[in-house]
Regions:
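Glycine-rich nucleophile elbow surrounding the catalytic serine of serine-hydrolase chemistry
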Residues: 1-9
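Flexible "cap/lid" loop of the alpha/beta hydrolase fold
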Residues: 8-48
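Short, well-ordered alpha-helices that flank and scaffold nucleotide-derived cofactor binding pockets
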Residues: 12-16, 125-128, 160
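Conserved alpha/beta-hydrolase catalytic His-Asp/Glu region
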Residues: 32-34, 48-101
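Short beta-strand/loop motif that positions the catalytic acidic residue
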Residues: 103, 109-111
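Short alpha-helix in the alpha/beta-hydrolase fold that links the catalytic acid
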Residues: 105, 119-128
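Acidic catalytic loop of the alpha/beta-hydrolase fold
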Residues: 114-118, 144
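Catalytic active-site module of serine/aspartate enzymes centered on a nucleophile-bearing elbow/loop
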Residues: 133-163
Length: 163
């Protein structure tokens, strides 16, 4: 489960738990085909994860700051195949609960303009479920980009939300 899954579950079960929330790049629409392909693909390709050249390709596709590569590579090498498969399956199969509509939290939903269409659909779905929410499409941003690569912009949005 990713961090936003925990947040969405908590908001779904405890509508009064917080006053404000930020949800960034959350996938809440199950991807059935992807889910079915995860195990066979990772059974075949897991051995590549510890190869530095492959990690560099993966890292580049994530659009992270170059200064984060050493940490990324170190963490990636520690992930077991079973944990990676479980994580990917959980992520691709998550479906937001309708009880999310009961939350009272003022919520900012962020998604990058350069994210995949399913991520934008997920953001829209969340905004339709949460009564006091706002969607912000971040122009030129990729998946998870603002909190990782543009922390100052992220902090400004947090400050605006809690005012």
């Amino acid at each position: 489960m990713e961090g936003y899954h925990f947040l969405l579950e908590i908001l779904s079960k405890n509508p009064d738990i917080c006053e404000c929330a930020i949800i960034e790049s959350a996938l809440v629409i199950p991807m059935d085909f992807t889910y079915k392909m995860i195990e066979p693909i990772f059974n075949l390709s897991y051995c590549l994860i510890s190869k530095k050249w492959f990690s560099k390709l993966q890292f580049k596709s994530l659009k992270l700051k170059k200064s984060l590569f050493a940490l990324y590579y170190e963490d990636t090498c520690k992930i077991t195949k079973d944990n990676l498969i479980a994580f990917m399956k959980s992520n691709s199969n998550y479906e937001v609960k309708n009880t999310l509509s009961h939350t009272k939290a003022k919520t900012l939903v962020l998604v990058g303009s350069k994210e995949r269409p399913i991520m934008k659909k997920s953001a829209t779905k969340i905004v339709h479920l949460i009564p006091n929410s706002e969607l912000e499409v971040l122009q030129g941003y990729y998946h998870g980009d603002i909190s990782i690569n543009h922390a100052d912009d992220y902090v400004e949005r947090v400050k605006r939300l809690v005012r």
